[in-house]
């Protein structure tokens, strides 16, 4: 049984999925077995009914969710991005499952866990990118501050270049330029 699980786990689309597969154990309860087999059959019908469907990304956000339970904690931008990816995947899967012609009632427990919050999803998209950088579009204040910093940076470079032009040529490197 363990070897079979290990083989199936190699096909998981995420580390979290792989861990869940490896944690499965046989059951002697006929009702549990029937329920699980029905769920697997419904999943197969879903995948076979939508040939171009592919598994959506499911980042492991357990750490971020754990942080969110602690008052005053702050997420790193990359964690926020990953939560946005999970929200997007959840919304899209929910739409695909609800829109399936068979209805797939066996997957009702999964559907109940899925979340759709487009406003939050869009807010996250405006706030951070896929590399975990906070974007100017995260807030108007941030955009103004960054624009002022860029302006100040340019002003300092111009001032240093003007000072550089007053230095005698014998002290200046031929390809010299000002960088900060």
PLM ranges: what are they?
Residues 142-180:
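Extended, Lys/Arg-enriched charged tracts that mediate electrostatic binding to polyanionic substrates
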Residues 1-149, 162:
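Conserved amphipathic alpha-helical "coupling/scaffold" segments
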């Amino acid at each position: 049984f363990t070897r079979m699980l290990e083989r199936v786990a190699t096909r998981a689309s995420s580390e979290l999925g792989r861990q869940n597969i490896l944690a499965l154990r046989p059951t002697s309860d006929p009702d549990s077995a029937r329920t699980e087999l029905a769920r697997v059959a419904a999943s197969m019908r879903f995948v076979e009914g939508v040939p171009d469907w592919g598994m959506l990304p499911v980042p492991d956000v357990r750490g971020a969710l754990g942080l969110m339970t602690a008052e005053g904690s702050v997420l790193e931008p990359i964690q926020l991005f990953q939560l946005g990816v999970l929200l997007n995947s959840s919304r899209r899967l929910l739409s695909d499952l609800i829109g399936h012609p068979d209805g797939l009632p066996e997957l009702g427990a999964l559907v109940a866990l899925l979340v759709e919050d487009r406003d939050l999803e869009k807010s996250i998209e405006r706030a951070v990118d896929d590399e975990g950088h906070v974007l100017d579009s995260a807030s108007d204040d941030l955009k103004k501050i960054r624009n002022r910093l860029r302006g100040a940076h340019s002003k300092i470079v111009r001032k240093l270049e003007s000072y550089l032009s007053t230095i005698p040529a014998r002290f200046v490197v031929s390809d010299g330029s000002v960088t900060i």
